[in-house]
């Protein structure tokens, strides 16, 4: 894969103010509407390539893993190991982890139709989470799948939701989006039938998808567990790589 908009490449040496300014520019350039994005049916039927993106961490390095699937079957894997130069700062994750992700995606010999990124998309203070940044850099439809809610407010409680339930996440006053804008969904991908102990995922469009389609695409990715199959496999690949490089 090649970068489509290299001017948005995250630079960890920037000041915090400059990072936030770049994120405003990214949000303005990104699209949160369906634009040449794969349909959920294409994902289910194997007519679209879906890349799961996740990371693991050593003391001073990030291990970025990408697993590409077609119809649930793995067709490609890539990774990159890159030094970490700044600490974790809420809302500025792309400046810490974006470089390793770019390196891993750039090594792919296939062109994914969708990126499924472990992290937020539009559910972000400046509407420019990791999935938005990555999707715009490569100009590929992207969706963010987060385990925790960074910002915004659920329109109703997300406690003990039945499997398959979707609850809109609305922008609040910590975000640049207008209050009440639906920026994503809490999605109960899996649930125990007798003990509702699994928390929902927080799904948001990264680039070239609307919020509703983002959830539809994640649901179409399938998987037996809470995480969609692409990011679950990327998570496992990242953990295996961490063990390999950690021993070195």
From Swiss-Prot:
Listed EC numbers: 3.1.21.7
GO molecular function, one term: single-stranded RNA binding
Catalytic function, reaction form: Endonucleolytic cleavage at apurinic or apyrimidinic sites to products with a 5'-phosphate
UniProt-annotated binding residues for Mg(2+): 54, 118
One GO biological process term: DNA repair
Its biological purpose: DNA repair enzyme involved in the repair of deaminated bases. Selectively cleaves double-stranded DNA at the second phosphodiester bond 3' to a deoxyinosine leaving behind the intact lesion on the nicked DNA.
CDD domains in the cross-refs: Endonuclease_V
Enzyme class: hydrolase
GO cellular component, one term: cytoplasm
Cofactor(s) needed: Mg(2+)
Record site feature (Interaction with target DNA), residues: 88
Keywords assigned: Cytoplasm, DNA damage, DNA repair, Endonuclease, Hydrolase, Magnesium, Metal-binding, Nuclease
UniProt family annotation: Belongs to the endonuclease V family.
Name under which the protein is recorded: Endonuclease V
Domain of life the protein comes from: Archaea
Localization of this protein: Cytoplasm
């Amino acid at each position: 894969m090649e970068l489509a908009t290299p001017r948005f490449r995250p630079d960890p040496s920037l000041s915090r103010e400059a990072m936030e300014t770049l994120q405003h520019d990214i949000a303005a350039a990104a699209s949160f509407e369906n634009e040449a994005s794969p349909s959920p049916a294409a994902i289910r039927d194997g007519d679209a390539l879906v890349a799961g993106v996740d990371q693991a961490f050593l003391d001073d390095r990030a291990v970025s893993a990408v697993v590409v699937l077609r119809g649930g079957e793995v067709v490609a894997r890539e990774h990159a190991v890159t030094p970490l130069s700044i600490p974790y700062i809420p809302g500025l994750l792309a400046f810490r982890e974006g470089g390793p992700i770019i390196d891993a995606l750039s090594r792919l010999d296939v062109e994914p139709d969708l990126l499924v990124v472990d992290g937020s998309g539009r559910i972000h203070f400046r509407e420019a989470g990791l999935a938005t940044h990555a999707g715009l850099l490569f100009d590929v439809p992207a969706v963010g799948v987060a385990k925790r809610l960074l910002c915004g407010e659920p329109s109703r409680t997300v406690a003990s939701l039945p499997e398959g339930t979707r609850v809109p996440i609305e922008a609040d006053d910590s975000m640049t989006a207008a209050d009440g804008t639906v920026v994503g969904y809490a999605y109960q991908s899996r649930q125990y039938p007798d003990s509702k102990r699994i928390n929902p995922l927080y799904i948001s469009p990264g680039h070239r998808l609307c919020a509703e389609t983002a959830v539809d695409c994640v649901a179409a990715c399938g998987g037996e567990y809470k995480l969609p199959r692409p990011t679950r496999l990327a998570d496992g690949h990242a953990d295996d790589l961490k063990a390999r490089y950690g021993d070195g």
